[in-house]
Amino acid sequence: MRFIAWLITLAENSDRIAEAAADRLRAKLGGHTDMVVRIVHFLLITAGISSPLLMYFAGAPLPVHILVYTAFFTYLIVYCIFPELKKYPTFRLRILADGTEQILAFFVTGIACLGIAAYTIWAAVCSVIPTLTAVSEGIVLFCAELVIFWNGIIKVYCTSVQLGLKYRVWGIVLGMVMPADLVMLVLIYRITRRECAFETEKALLNKSRRDDQLCRTKYPLLLVHGVFFRDSKLMNYWGRIPAELEANGAVIFYGEQQSAASVEDSAAELADRIEQLVQKTGCGKVNIIAHSKGGLDSRYAISKLGSDKYVASLTTINTPHHGCLFAEYLLNTAPEKFVKSVEKIYNSAFKRLGDPNPDFLAAVTDLTNSRCEQFDQDTPDAPGVMYQSVGSHARCSKSGRFPLNLSYPIVKKYDGDNDGLVALTSAPWGEDFTVLHPTGKRGITHADVIDLNRENIPGFDFREFYVQLVNKLKMRGF
């Protein structure tokens, strides 16, 4: 009971104990502390795994065997709590880093275990060691590696964002298939190691500039979603972007319009929402950041429904201001019966989810090239409101996830460079147009630009882009 109580106390005070130990070691070892700690752990684990052989050749009595086994597995428990002493800005990142470190330990000590296991089998066959020693060695080796592996994999599965569902499922499916399981484990290690390094850097950056309040704009932000989605607390349409903006001082509200309706109907909902926010908070105006069709909804509300007096700026993200030939192609070529069937299923499903009157066909129709051409003529910009836009494009069909990987080549055929849905030539609007060019082979899709998939893309930091975007609004007095 005392041992269990000690373990509970150790876990409760783990952060403080780890930080104190790390500070003392860094004072002595300097910048090599983390590597030294890692090597020491690997050596101790290897020595512990080899302990049955070592004690046999040393002629150790039974009490020493019991003492060594107890000490080794107590050490393993402590190692599961403190695999490294490096500090991390959040609890999630610390657990993620610990799990990643333990996966590495499993690999490194596993290589040593192959040699130990091979020698044990040879020694037992040649009668160099008794069968009991060989069995003891096998049990200790198996249990130690099992503890290290499962501790590491459970930690990264529970805390990693970048693994996503795909890698988690593949990890389980290939878990018992040699050597695919080892290849998958290497991939998981690489993903979580990069995630931990990137997220730690971001957290430290936000901490260092917290007092600067980069995103504390004069007017709050209103984030307006695109078509076929709803604002949800369970899964934020804007991914990790709102949390990043709020960490830098932003005040954020959401459009809360239906998932699919005509531009006119969605705009009416937005206009009511904006007026209610202004009256309730006394903020005077809002800065709208709208994605996809949300940009058209916002333009209509500002120009036609009197929201111009409540809106300081409108920033559209990958909005099809000049329409989507892809949408027009679908409506013109798809069988009417099929379109009606999809419409019925969609409207029924989203009505159950809370939309009062979803209208799939009206939403898609208002995104067509011909409808948007007329919309642009009938919806001039309101004076006194600052308009600007952002667009991006993918590199190829493999850049995006389903269904963007299927729609990209079709949009490419009709509209050229696109994000999987919206052509780059359709996105410009207002006094300034920012193009987000992909730096690698992947590109930036319609979903990527709002962090819908919560995926870190090498070469472009979406969250930092939005921080700087909002900071520019602040610097301009909005």
Language-model-derived ranges and their functions:
Residues 2-234:
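Flexible, membrane-associating and regulatory peripheral segments of lipid-active enzymes
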Residues 37, 41-44, 51-64, 225, ...:
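Serine-dependent carboxylesterase/thioesterase catalytic core
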Residues 228-229, 259-260, 293-295, 320-322, ...:
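Solvent-exposed loop/turn segments at secondary-structure junctions
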Residues 213-285:
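Active-site catalytic motif of lipid deacylating hydrolases and related acyltransferases
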Residues 235-236, 324-330, 398-403:
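Short aromatic-enriched loop/helix-cap "lid" or pocket-rim segments at secondary-structure transitions
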Residues 138-142, 165-175, 179, 381-478:
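C-terminal catalytic-base region of ester-bond hydrolases, centering on the histidine
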Residues 2, 6-9, 308-312, 316-317, ...:
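Soluble, non-transmembrane catalytic domains of enzymes that act on hydrophobic metabolites at membranes
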Residues 222, 253, 313-315, 388-390, ...:
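Hydrophobic/aromatic beta-strand patches that form the interior of the parallel beta-sheet core
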